[in-house]
Structures are given as C-alpha cells and as structure tokens.
A protein has these predicted regions:
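A short hydrophobic beta-strand segment most commonly corresponding to one strand
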Residues: 165-168, 240-253
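Non-heme Fe(II)-dependent double-stranded beta-helix
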Residues: 1-22, 29-142, 148
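A structural signal for short, well-ordered beta-strand segments and their strand-loop junctions
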Residues: 27-29, 117-125, 169, 178-182, ...
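Acidic, His- and aromatic-enriched active-site or binding-groove loops in soluble protein domains
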Residues: 142-162
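Double-stranded beta-helix
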Residues: 174-233
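Short, solvent-exposed loop/turn segments at secondary-structure junctions
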Residues: 32-35, 133, 147, 172-175, ...
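Short proline/glycine-enriched turn/loop segments at secondary-structure junctions
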Residues: 235-239
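Short, conserved, surface-exposed binding loops centered on an aromatic residue
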Residues: 155-160, 170-173, 215-217
Length: 253
C-alpha cells in the first residue's frame, strides 16, 4: 500500500512539472472557506427541495438533510430523482457563483471569457453531482468531454473552440476517490463507441487505455481545470459519505 501511495505521489509530482498544454489539466487554488460554504448552502437547499418535490420528507434527524448523508436514506427511485435538470443551478445561483475569486484567477491565467451554456438553458450552466459509496453506477466511465459535446449536445467543432472543463469537489475525502485523469491523453486520438441512453446519444469507451493514469487527491473546494479532450473518469469510493461536486465548462480567449 505504501509503495502504491509513493508511486502515485511521484506520478503527480512528475505531472506537475509539465505545462498545462502538456499534461492537459491543472489543479487551481482552493476556494475560500466562505465561498465553499456558499456552495454547500446552495446545494443543500436544492437537495432538500428536490427530495420534497418527490414527497420525501421523512428525515430521521437534521444530519440527513445534508447531501453528504444522502446514502443513509432509503431511496428506491434514485435515478428518477436526480436527473440533470434537478441538479442545474438557477440563474441567480450561477450569478452568485460567478462572483467568486476563482474567476479572477481564471481570467488572469487562462483568459476566461464566460461559463458556457452547454444544454441551452439560457444562462451560464453550472451543475452538481452526488456519488454514493459502493455505487459504481453513480460515476462516469473513462471519457473526454468533447465526445459528449459532439454526440449528446450536438455541438460543432467551432462551438467547442476554446472550451475547458472545471470540476470542484465540495464533499470529498482525498484518499477515498474523486477524479482520475490520464495526463497527456488529450494529445492522442482515442476510438470509442456511442450508445443511446435516456433518449440521448452518449459516448462509451469499451477498453482500458494503455496510458498512465493518476487519481487526483483533491480537497473540498480545490478545483481542477482540464482540456475537453483529456481522458478522465469518476472514481467510486467506499467511505461512509456521499461525495458532492460541481462542474461546468468555460470559454477562454
């Protein structure tokens, strides 16, 4: 276990010596604690309202009103409840998020222009995810976001120009799963299939890439930005909590 940990640490340290263009991702400065709490409050309110909309009111105690305790509830229609539409920030919530210091950093370092509206909702699209312990169906398989932009969202190459993706863990234990990446994989072409799921065309990779991968040990509020063509994947976890994260695409100059 120690050897594995040391190897992982060495891989991360080596990857960090490369430029963003070479590795295809970068870990950004953490959000301020007060900003992280704003996000937790937004998500908690949306979480409780969505459960109430599905007539789920029976919380044993207030702790179960916290998204990180969601896995302790007896929910039979999980996938029905948590469609993407239930997890998209409102326009007001998005505006509040755009006031965060993160966007000044993105403007200075990456030429940030705007948060993209991938689904055509009419305003900057930011959404959150929950991943229960020991539920591999809650995490995404290995993919590049450009595949979804192309097939699921029907975006042209021109519409995808200068798009980058950002993922921020809100509730996470760094050593119990989060986001895995394949550094440098955005510089290669990968074959993949497509399937129809939930009425939409989605990409699917049916093999394990012969390429180095790294699990990023991100802390709550520590964002990672990555190229739309970078191979990455959600990591399942076993710890007694529900992982919560947000993600969005940005357009840069």
């Amino acid at each position: 276990m120690l050897t594995s940990f040391n190897n992982q640490k060495q891989q991360i340290e080596h990857s960090q010596t490369l430029s963003f263009a070479e590795r295809g991702y970068a870990i950004l400065p953490s959000l301020y604690e007060k900003e992280l709490e704003v996000l937790r409050t937004i998500i908690r309110k949306k979480y409780i309202k969505t459960l109430e909309d599905f007539h789920i009111f029976d919380f044993t105690n207030d702790e179960f009103k916290q998204p990180f305790n969601y896995h302790n509830l007896s929910i039979e229609n999980h996938s029905e409840i948590w469609g993407k539409q239930q997890r998209i920030f409102s326009e007001y919530e998005s505006e509040e998020f755009l006031k965060f210091s993160l966007f000044d950093y993105l403007k200075n370092k990456f030429g940030f222009l705007k948060v993209a509206d991938i689904e055509g909702i009419g305003y900057p699209e930011i959404y959150w995810r929950i991943v229960r312990p020991n539920k591999t169906e809650d995490v995404s398989g290995i993919h590049a976001d450009s595949w979804f932009f192309t097939h699921t969202n029907k975006m042209t190459p021109k519409e995808q120009d200068n798009l980058l993706k950002i993922w921020i863990p809100i509730e996470v234990l760094p050593n119990e799963g989060g986001l895995g990446v394949y550094p440098g994989s955005h510089l290669k072409k990968w074959d993949y299939d497509t399937i129809k799921k939930d009425g939409r065309i989605k990409p699917k990779l049916n093999y394990l890439p012969n390429h180095e991968k790294i699990l990023l040990p991100l802390k709550p509020g520590e964002p990672v930005i990555f190229d739309k063509n970078l191979l990455h994947y959600g990591v399942s976890h076993k710890a007694d909590y529900t992982r919560v994260s947000i993600e969005f695409a940005i357009q840069v100059s």
